[in-house]
Amino acid sequence: MSLAHSLKSFNSFGLAQSCADLVEAHSKEAVQAMCLPLWQQQLPMLVLGGGSNLVFTEDFNGTVVRVLSKGIKVSEDAEAFYLEVEAGENWHELIQFTLEHGMFGLENMALIPGTVGAAPIQNIGAYGVELCDVCDWVEYLDLPSGEFVRISTAECQFAYRESIFKDKLRNLAVVTAVGLRLVKRWQPRLAYGPLQSFDPATVTAREIFERVCQVRSEKLPDPAVLGNAGSFFKNPIVSAACYLDLAQRFPTIVGYAQADATVKLAAGWLIEQAGLKGFVLGNAAVHDKQALVLVNRGGATGRDICRLALHVIAQVQDKFGVVLEAEPRIMGANGEGDLYV
């Protein structure tokens, strides 16, 4: 028997799960008022932004708090624009706002689904730019103290799809606002695939934005039509020696050298070369245009998605010796779990 409140329209996979209670917070004070009593009573609680990075495997036996706070404040000095953005703002709409007001630097991250509050948790990124490149600070509700805390970018301990919010502050913090610093002497970032054809001397931020939107729209299915969470797997990072070994065996392997001498592999390429592009398992499938994306073909459960993900991980490991990691959070009845449900 499902619980009182359906979550189907609040998760981009379109999974038909429910929760015991569903509340909306339209300000950081409301976040504080709603989340603190739940945390203090040790009751199951899930803070939800856009629901674009979640796989529900069961009904959630607790309260889902939807963060819907809005607001963008802008200040500037000679060097940069400074934005204070509330957690409930839509990420893509924020990028549109910055472009309309002559502020550049976010355009490579166009069409990443979700809200601003989720951005620092995952250190979201695309086409060579990550949130950490433009983040100035993050404000969060510290659940143990009940106070609002603001920490610097360095204190966020950002790494590839990682942050302090997934580590030391996991389940202890609710992001309420993000500070961004967009420099006025804008430099285009054109290292990745579809952007390499641009001339860095003449390209505009708007042109990059439109190209990224075009490419993402062609490759990534619309969640309203075909449920998905965008990129399901992280691009694995391997040692230079491992990469050279793989490149000898698979000369067309796609890899990007990192500053610390490691190499980031293209997970989509690995999945496709393992023969899994378009692979179907029940009502879940690997997308036939972008192998990095798992989709709900209609009627899939969270467990179906997890079973497919485990199959992909096993096949890629068998062929390449590389272990893929899932990006989305896996949510069970009482909190976060893993793929093995």
UniProtKB/Swiss-Prot annotation:
Residues 15-185 form the FAD-binding PCMH-type domain. Its EC number is 1.3.1.98. GO terms for biological process: cell division; cell wall organization; peptidoglycan biosynthetic process; regulation of cell shape. Its cofactor is FAD. The active site is at R161, S231 (proton donor), E327. Keywords: Cell cycle, Cell division, Cell shape, Cell wall biogenesis/degradation, Cytoplasm, FAD, Flavoprotein, NADP, Oxidoreductase, Peptidoglycan synthesis. It catalyses: UDP-N-acetyl-alpha-D-muramate + NADP(+) = UDP-N-acetyl-3-O-(1-carboxyvinyl)-alpha-D-glucosamine + NADPH + H(+). The keyword Flavoprotein applies. Gene3D superfamilies: 3.30.465.10, UDP-N-acetylenolpyruvoylglucosamine reductase, C-terminal domain (3.90.78.10), Uridine Diphospho-n-acetylenolpyruvylglucosamine Reductase, domain 2 (3.30.43.10). The keyword Iron does not apply. Coiled coil: none annotated. GO terms for cellular component: cytosol. Pathway: Cell wall biogenesis; peptidoglycan biosynthesis. HAMAP family: MurB. Belongs to the MurB family. Cell wall formation. This is UDP-N-acetylenolpyruvoylglucosamine reductase. It comes from Shewanella baltica (strain OS195).
